[in-house]
Swiss-Prot record:
Its cofactor is Mg(2+). GO terms for biological process: carbohydrate metabolic process; peptidoglycan biosynthetic process; UDP-N-acetylglucosamine biosynthetic process. Its EC number is 5.4.2.10. The keyword Signal does not apply. One of its GO terms (cellular component) is cytosol. Keywords: Isomerase, Magnesium, Metal-binding, Phosphoprotein. It comes from the Bacteria. Belongs to the phosphohexose mutase family. The active site is at residue 107. InterPro entries: A-D-PHexomutase_a/b/a-I, A-D-PHexomutase_a/b/a-I/II/III, A-D-PHexomutase_a/b/a-II, A-D-PHexomutase_a/b/a-III, A-D-PHexomutase_C, A-D-PHexomutase_C_sf, Alpha-D-phosphohexomutase_SF, GlmM_bact. This is Phosphoglucosamine mutase.
Amino acid sequence: MPKMFGTDGVRGLANRDLTARLALDLGDAAVRVLGDAGTQDDQPEGRRRALVGRDTRVSGDFLASALSAGMAAGGFDVIDAGIIPTPGIAFLTSVLNVEMGAVISASHNPMPDNGIKFFARGGFKLPDQKEDDIEAVLGQDWDRPTGAGVGRVSHDQTTATNLYIDHLVATIAPLNDDKTQPKPLKGLKIVADCANGATSVVAPEALRRAGADVIVINASPDGYNINKNAGSTHPEQLQAMVKATDAVMGVAFDGDADRCLAVDEDGNMINGDQIMGILARAKQREGKLNHDTLVVTVMSNLGLKLALKDMGIKTVETAVGDRYVLEEMLKGDYSLGGEQSGHVINREFATTGDGTLTALTLCNEVVKSGKSLKELAADFPQLPQTLINVPNVDKKAASTNKRIQDAVAREEELLGDTGRVLLRPSGTEPLVRVMAEAATQAYADEVCTRLAKIVAEELAL
């Protein structure tokens, strides 16, 4: 039986793969596994609590109701925070000291999909073992509470949202002694593309409270338009709007706002690698980049690593997935990490990738540095990169096939220090991703095409 939890929780087609019944069972199982982390005396009035939030997909309503029902039936009082970014639930799980948090979202996926991910006390995503434990007891009967032992479900989107926005603004603009709000972004004209998703209220409000002049697009969710030709996966509107309005930059979020990409004043995309480079150098300048190290994944561009090396900043690599980035950050006491896709974890303020926090911090660095985003990003040039997905192959054999490994070694020898290759099996599909970076796009294309051909020939199902 295939593993239910993927790299970011449980995902699938809502009402087909991810049903109300499954959401109910997941809530029930999560109570059994995560409820063991503490005793009922840990919480006010002896009741254990869970926090649930969601993005703007229409299926989020019935899935939230079912998930909450499973938790309440297991004896947890559930606070339904309504529509709120994923990192908002992580933050509130920590500050409200609830036993666990859960988010119903499929992030950047199309609207028909949805997903469920959990946070343990403290606001951290679950390790693989805890997800395995939940899966192991899924659907099993157990001695559930009765009578006064069952939980209640309450709804409080306003309080949850306001607490989260206050936190975000305070990361770059803590209140003055007289309780007035500083405006560090005053005069900064930016465009924010909210993907018609969970940060449609949060990001514009946080940026404006910090003083920015914000032009907002794709912030009218209707349940069906999340990520539709909008946000970080479709930045064309943002690029055009930045140029049309003479904004100094733009920021784009995905559906649950755990990632952020940016656009400079000319409409050029600034990816997660470049954003991490800019923020790492800023933290280094302020003495806040622990061990002068940035945590990245194997997908981060070699150009980033070479540029950081010249600045005296080391990089540590992990597998793809912000949960693995965080695990490495905690293990090595590192303060900043992330992914090329725009997940950036700033441990000073967050326990997971937070797109709105990234946008605020990036805007603040533009102001502090006195440079444009284009100028800042230019210090982190990206090597040309080619990625080819090779479908319908035995992905598990990629690392042991001799012809493939010999071909990889040969290409690496030819590239030397001017590029690299990477073969990465998909976590969810029978395919292998072949990536090559080189000094020119043409050479990256050549290398990637040669390797993809060999992978297809050797591993075809």
